[in-house]
Regions:
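Flexible, acidic/Gly-rich N-terminal and inter-domain linker regions that tether
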Residues: 1-103
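Conserved Radical SAM active-site core
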Residues: 90-210, 220-222
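Conserved strand-turn element in the central/C-terminal portion of the radical SAM core barrel
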Residues: 116, 152-158, 188-194, 223-232, ...
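Alpha-helix N-cap and loop-to-helix initiation/capping positions
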Residues: 131, 164, 168, 231-234, ...
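Oxyanion-binding "anion nests"
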Residues: 240
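A glycine-rich beta-turn/hairpin centered on an aromatic-Pro dipeptide
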Residues: 274
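Single conserved hydrophobic/aromatic residue that forms the stacking wall/gate
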Residues: 278-281, 285-288
């Protein structure tokens, strides 16, 4: 039996091609895209303006990503943390943070992670699999429906390394920012990476207007390699060259992330090179 595919993962262009292959007119694709990415339905039977024969075919070939809320924790400040169970049983975490300017959701891009950062719990079991574009979208849709308020900002800083799931993350960004969907603008999206340099260069060529955050966490290779194995492949000086290329190609500023670990990277001797060598050189700032 052929495995069903996630219709939520298809871009509008891909969905149009699929429907034309079924002998359907092109306008059906936009209607279906609206149902999935604007009206946020999770059942084909809810698509009331579609022919029943088409819905039956779609039901046979596709599914709509609709994770189950396994656990929900809400803090006093309104922050909501979800444990979401995907269709195959894998669980990921999603967090909604409320600010005066709107609601931000932190999404996962993988089930597990293979980057091996010493300070990150999500990497302990390694990477189980990449999430599909539609599954990442469904984190946002599930949270939005649960809180009953619009999600206005996205940070790709949950479980997984976004650039290690490059193609699906690019499709996710296309769908989530589409005017035919929830239409969250690129300037309201932040992507965090540990520094996969080849993928960073590939992202730069896309010239997206998102905000890039690079996990630095150390001023030099000795400390960073001890905290982040990725530094062995792409040491600090190589990463900084890639950051410079990204800035020059996109015209966008890059921010750095720096988790302070007592006795490891929190001394004045660490702070000075971070401030003078990295931040000032790239005209940027760090989130501590």
């Amino acid at each position: 039996m052929e495995t069903k595919r996630c219709i939520s993962s298809l871009t509008l262009e891909q969905l149009t091609a699929e429907l034309k292959a079924m002998g359907q007119p092109g306008f059906r694709a936009k209607q279906l895209f609206h149902w999935v990415h604007q009206k946020l339905v999770t059942d084909f039977s809810a698509m009331t303006d579609q022919p029943k024969a088409l819905l039956a075919k779609l039901e046979e070939a596709f599914y709509i990503a609709a994770p189950i809320i396994e656990r929900r924790q809400e803090a006093k400040d309104g922050t909501v943390k979800y444990l979401l169970r995907m269709a195959d049983g894998n669980c990921i975490e999603t967090v909604v943070m409320r600010y005066h300017y709107g609601n931000t959701v932190c999404v996962s891009t993988q089930a597990g992670c293979r980057m091996g950062c010493r300070f990150c719990a999500s990497t302990q079991a390694g990477r189980v699999r990449n999430l599909e574009a539609g599954e990442i979208c469904s984190e946002i849709y599930t949270a939005q429906k649960d809180i009953g308020e619009r999600i206005s900002h996205i940070v790709l800083m949950g479980i997984g390394e976004p650039l290690d799931n490059f193609d699906e993350v690019m499709r996710f960004l296309e769908n989530i920012s589409s005017p035919e969907g929830v239409n969250i603008g690129m300037r309201n999206i932040s992507l965090s990476t540990c520094g996969l340099v080849p993928k960073l260069d590939q992202l730069a060529e896309k010239k997206l207007q998102l905000t890039l955050s690079v996990s630095l966490h150390a001023p030099n290779n000795d400390i960073r390699s001890g905290m982040m194995p990725v530094n062995d492949a792409y040491p600090v000086e190589v990463l900084m060259q890639a950051v410079r290329r990204y800035q020059e190609t996109t015209g966008r500023r890059v921010s750095f992330e720096y988790s302070m670990v007592r006795g490891v990277n929190d001394s004045d001797a660490c702070a000075r090179p971070v401030s003078y060598t990295h931040l000032r050189a790239h005209e940027t700032a760090a989130n501590l």
